Amino acid sequence: MQLSNSLRSARSAAASSGCALASRPVVACRRVTPSVTRPGPFTIATGPLLPASRSKAGGGIRVFSSALYEFGQQLKEDLDHDLSRARVDAIANKTRIAELEQQRRILMAVGGMADDEPELKAALMQLEEILGVSFNELQLMLAETLADHPAKMDNLAAMAAVVGTGSDGGGDESGDRDTADAADADGDGGERAWLRFKADVHACLADLRNRKDGITLHRAIVKDMVRASSNPGARRSSSSVDKMARQELDRLMPFLLDDFLDKMPGLKAAFTGKAEPGAEGDDGEGEEEGEAQDVGEDAVDSSSSGGGGGVLSCAAWQQVLGRTVRAVSPTLALVLARGYLAMAPRQYRALALVRMILPGKTGGGVDGALTRKEGLSLLKKLRPGISGLADKDKQWLEWVIARLAAEFAVQSAGDGHEPEPKRPELPPTAVQRKPPAEEQHKPTAGARDSPNM
């Protein structure tokens, strides 16, 4: 009984569990064979990210656009334009310079200048445009004379580098000089020449500001002035002058210059021809005082004749450089020799043109490019009879060459056989070569060139 009951209960439990299991096949079937289809796994597209019309090369896509980018592009275009224009201008300038060089070669090769004067003036006008230098009629006449004598031009090619200071020798002050020349005929020409000389020295020293070595020369001249000055307010030591700035030197030099020139022994007498009251030479000899008076008379005579315009004559200029200025301040003598063209008569100042019409020539110069050997060679060309130069320093050669080259430029142009012109006296240290024995008793023009100077 109990067994049948247990079996019956087991069957009922199995039947109930079977009903439960019978209701689950649907769920089990969903897992094996789902009734709803799901999408497949996610895949990355391999096609272009951008549209085909915009992904092509050269499609004009601007990756970055801003005001800075626009400015950079404009700046690049402007620089390219300026560079192209500069290249064109440089080529044009080189072509023009080559044409002028050819003009110069033609002029140097021509024996006579009668038919070539228009070409010379045209070349000078072109040089005026390039160099910014004005040429007056007197300079044109000198250029024609030089071109008419190629041998003289060849010598002056080297001399111009020594004497030419870059000044156009122009006519800015010509009106003032003409007025002063007219006044000299009515009054004391020597005194006016002395005042004009002092003004020219001021201008010559003021020009040192524009020179590369100007501060060095400026300082050396101030040292000489301080050393010779008796003014208590101007007393300075050499070390203090070395420490001065350019502005302080510029203020001190004009304060000392007039007194320095007035007290320089024999300098004023070279202009006025009058012996200085109470002046005594260092060597106690009266010979130099007499020579200074003679030289001063020559200077006044030359100014009254209209040739020098109240400016130092050749001999007087040599006196200033050799006997006075150089003895007190060698640096000042060198600076004045450099600036001689600005202080000389107009026909001498025209020598500055030589440097302009010979741009292709290479030469020396008082700034150091002229070697001692070149200076000796050039000096012997200017003065073939000079000797005794072995012990002369380079500075001595520079200011003597500067003086003689100016004289050489204005010698009268003849057929090449003209008599030897009168030459200025050299310093007493220069020894003249004696003429041969058979010529010593002949009265020649060279007799006035005495070796005892």
From Swiss-Prot:
It comes from the Eukaryota. Residues 1-28 form the signal peptide. This is Ezy-1 protein. It comes from Chlamydomonas reinhardtii. Residues 279-300 have a biased composition (Acidic residues). Keywords: Signal. Residues 167-187, 272-307, 412-453 are annotated as: Disordered. Residues 415-425 have a biased composition (Basic and acidic residues).
